[in-house]
Amino acid sequence: EYINEVEEDDFDEYMERIYDVMFDCVNRGLETQGVLPGKLEVKRKANRIFTEVSNDKDPYDLLRKRTMAFAYAAAEENASGGLIVTAPTCGAAGVLPACLRYAIELDLYEHHEIMDALKVAGLIGNIVKENGSISGAEAGCQAEVGTACSMAAAFLAYLDTKDVDEIV
């Protein structure tokens, strides 16, 4: 409620775009094979991991490994110059999209609940940005990935509790 009160009227449209870009980014990364651009010739992993775990019998392993594939997919899209969401930065662009796709795969939540959870994740990212640093150049990669993990934790916690006060 707080977020909707203080944001612009078109904020929901903006968040829908964030959702779409994250979802599409993971999908593209899962579908693409080969090597990443550049001289290092780093092989893409997301498609292979996603395909291999489809035969996994343990449902917890299946979900865990699929989520890992989602994170790789978004990170590989970033590394190949694809369209991503900086959440909070390019260097950590796989964390929140992986959790978003995880939540969608669980099929336990309504779309509006996932959208509200994304807003809470953004709130956490803004708190860190205003009171600390999300910049790898300024505070090291732990600032980027730590913030992304905090945002993802808030996203998942909101889906579980629907209580922003408990999260913040």
Task: Label each region the model flagged.
Residues 5-140:
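Accessory "access/gating" subregions that flank catalytic or transport cores
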Residues 127-168:
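Hydrophobic alpha-helical bundle architecture
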